[in-house]
A protein has these predicted regions:
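Replace the tail clause
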Residues: 1-365, 369-372
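Primarily a tetratricopeptide repeat
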Residues: 167, 171, 231, 235, ...
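Glycine-rich, acidic and aromatic/proline-enriched surface loops and short helix-turn segments
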Residues: 175-182, 384-395
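Glycine-rich cofactor-pocket loops
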Residues: 189, 193, 370-380, 394-408
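Phosphate/diphosphate-binding loops
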Residues: 267-294, 421-450
Length: 467
């Protein structure tokens, strides 16, 4: 009802334009810069309100139908802005003018010198000042995994011999794994946690998140040798192989959070349900281990997690007794039974677009995991996905953006070229097949020719002969 009212208001007072950020990352980038300039940060879904001349004066991220938890509601916002437009239009136009002037100034800004290590040290200090020592991650709720930040900290800690940086990354990686943001039954990570403990996720799973998280966990395994990290990476890639891989080799974008119209329904359990699948004894033990309780932790049911279990296996390299090893194998068997049971539920909708940029990240993750973990099947996944892109998303020496149901569309953007080149370089490092290096070099030349600004430096998001 709330959204119906909002729809009525939108159609009466506004002209609505919906942008698919996956197909038009260039348009998304323009308006994300507006949001970041106005609010200091951005996010999705992104809401922009503009004048008829397309000059933005409001920006925000997620808006609930009605105000709650101190957050303005969509319905109230639409009413207020429409009223201001009628009675105080000059104020809104002034706001639009200020943000436009700021963005033009930023566009003209030039860098006087190459960035140095001072900037890198500053980034580390910023992370250290914002680190959640108890739960891992940075800041409060909602919490995003930000694997790129964790990879930076691991690299910085290694190069600068800064143990604090490595500790921040490791605490975060462990706590995310223990939380409900990680799917302990089916593998893979959800987009973000609604709470600071990583317990209750927004249940949508995205390919790019899981690609970068796989890279982070593989990197942590390479640094420490702790099997926990290697095991999480394996579960991520097992999930991608089972749920997000096209029969021809490409990787799908992700899975929705809802089934039967209810967010998270696919992922939660009751103790009775667990015991019915596993039997009373095994079911009770599983519930104790994974926090499945009668009162639940999410709308009366439970998201499996290890946050309350201090005895979880953290490092198999420490060695197991025969009894402990048998218990571990039993847990794996229980997880498989629950996975097969869960498959009988109403399946989650898949976004079956295949994007060059996101596939590039996942190819990198699979190839690197194959090399570091010694699993050739992951390299095979990467090889097949690269072949899919080469066959279906490269035309006349240029890349496309996406493929779906036999149709490739969209002029490739900068991130498509950059991510695909990274994928080719990673495949070369892993396989030593020179064809990958040759293709990476050729695509890099095309990227420089089409996107590089030879006067001021830097790369444009769209090609010089693009729209």
């Amino acid at each position: 009802v709330c959204y119906f009212t909002a729809h009525e208001h939108l159609n009466r007072e506004y002209i609505c334009v919906k942008v698919d950020r996956e197909e038009r990352p260039d348009v998304d980038a323009v308006y994300m810069s507006v949001c970041q300039a106005m609010n200091g940060q951005g996010g999705w879904p992104l809401t922009i309100i503009m004048t008829p001349a397309c000059r933005p004066f409001f920006s925000g991220t997620y808006l609930p139908p009605k105000a709650r938890y101190g957050r303005v509601g969509l319905e109230e916002l639409l009413t207020a802005v429409a009223g201001q437009w009628k009675t105080n239009r000059g104020k809104l136009l002034d706001s639009a003018g200020r943000i436009e002037a700021y963005l033009k100034e930023q566009e003209r800004a030039t860098v006087s010198a190459e960035p140095g290590m001072d900037l890198v040290h500053q980034a580390f200090r910023q992370f250290a000042g914002n680190f959640d020592k108890k739960n891992g991650g940075f800041g409060g709720a909602p919490k995003f995994p930000t694997p790129h930040n964790l990879m930076f900290l691991m690299e910085y800690g290694t190069r600068e011999k800064k143990r604090e940086a490595l500790t921040m990354a490791e605490i975060t990686l462990v706590q995310m794994y223990r939380g409900g943001i990680f799917d302990h039954i089916g593998g893979g990570f959800s987009r973000y946690s609604t709470d600071e403990r990583w317990l209750v996720p927004h249940f949508e799973k995205m390919l790019y998140d899981n690609a970068l998280l796989a890279l982070a966990y593989v990197g942590a395994f390479g640094l420490t040798g702790r099997e926990l990290y290697g095991g999480v990476a394996r579960k991520i890639l097992a999930y991608v192989g089972a749920e997000l891989t096209d029969a021809q080799g490409g990787f799908y974008c992700g899975q929705d959070a809802d089934s039967d119209g209810v967010e998270g329904k696919y992922y939660v359990f009751t103790p009775k349900e667990i015991c019915r699948v596993l039997g009373e004894n095994a079911g009770t033990a599983f519930c104790d281990r994974y926090g499945i309780t009668e009162h639940g932790n999410f709308e009366g049911k439970s998201i499996p997690n290890l946050l309350g279990n201090e005895a979880y296996e953290e490092d198999v390299n420490a060695g197991y007794t025969k009894a402990e090893q048998a218990k571990k194998e039993l847990t794996i068997a229980d997880l498989q039974k629950l996975y097969e049971y869960r498959l009988q539920r109403t399946r989650l909708h898949k976004d079956d677009k295949i994007l060059v940029s996101w596939n590039g990240w996942m190819i990198c993750a699979c190839a690197k995991a194959g090399a570091v973990l010694g699993e050739t099947e992951y390299v095979d996944l990467a090889v097949r996905a690269e072949a899919f892109i080469r066959k279906n998303l490269a035309r006349n020496g240029r890349l496309m953006v996406r493929y779906r149901d036999g149709d490739a569309a969209g002029e490739g953007k900068l991130d498509d070229y950059a991510c695909y080149i990274l994928a080719l370089l990673e495949l070369y490092r892993v396989t030593f097949q020179e064809e990958y290096l040759a293709r990476a070099s050729a695509w890099a030349e095309t990227m420089i020719e089409q996107f590089f600004d030879r006067e001021r430096g830097g790369f444009y998001l769209t090609a010089k002969d693009g729209e």
